[in-house]
């Protein structure tokens, strides 16, 4: 198994939210996470609001949680937040059987994924760069 990885330390101008065991494949979740990575939070929320992907609602909820953590726990300015990181991790894979013809069965895999969103407060000089 090895040694457990150390958690990433947050800087003073960062806040994060984690959604664990989302019922979606990591590959599909990463498509939505990549769409908001590096954007201002209000722009990212607007993109998630109108996204046609099924998992966009859960990603939006996690982003709103990260924004609330930044405001309430870290006293950061909500208007100056950007999505610094949005990354996806693999979780469990549930195995199910699907009955087929002639008494056979095939395996269905139902993957799960973890989502971590880190928001960072930036100053006006950093936004222009």
Curated annotation (Swiss-Prot):
Keywords: Ribonucleoprotein, Ribosomal protein, RNA-binding, rRNA-binding. GO terms for molecular function: rRNA binding; structural constituent of ribosome. GO terms for cellular component: cytosolic large ribosomal subunit. The keyword rRNA-binding applies. Pfam families: Ribosomal_L22 (PF00237). CDD domains: Ribosomal_L22 (cd00336). One of its GO terms (biological process) is translation. The keyword rRNA-binding applies. It comes from the Bacteria. InterPro entries: Ribosomal_uL22, Ribosomal_uL22_bac/chlpt-type, Ribosomal_uL22_bac/org-type, Ribosomal_uL22_CS, Ribosomal_uL22_sf. Part of the 50S ribosomal subunit. This protein binds specifically to 23S rRNA; its binding is stimulated by other ribosomal proteins, e.g. L4, L17, and L20. It is important during the early stages of 50S assembly. It makes multiple contacts with different domains of the 23S rRNA in the assembled 50S subunit and ribosome. The globular domain of the protein is located near the polypeptide exit tunnel on the outside of the subunit, while an extended beta-hairpin is found that lines the wall of the exit tunnel in the center of the 70S ribosome. PANTHER family: CHLOROPLAST 50S RIBOSOMAL PROTEIN L22-RELATED, LARGE RIBOSOMAL SUBUNIT PROTEIN UL22M. Belongs to the universal ribosomal protein uL22 family. HAMAP family: Ribosomal_uL22_B. This is Large ribosomal subunit protein uL22. It comes from Rhizobium etli (strain ATCC 51251 / DSM 11541 / JCM 21823 / NBRC 15573 / CFN 42). The gene is rplV.
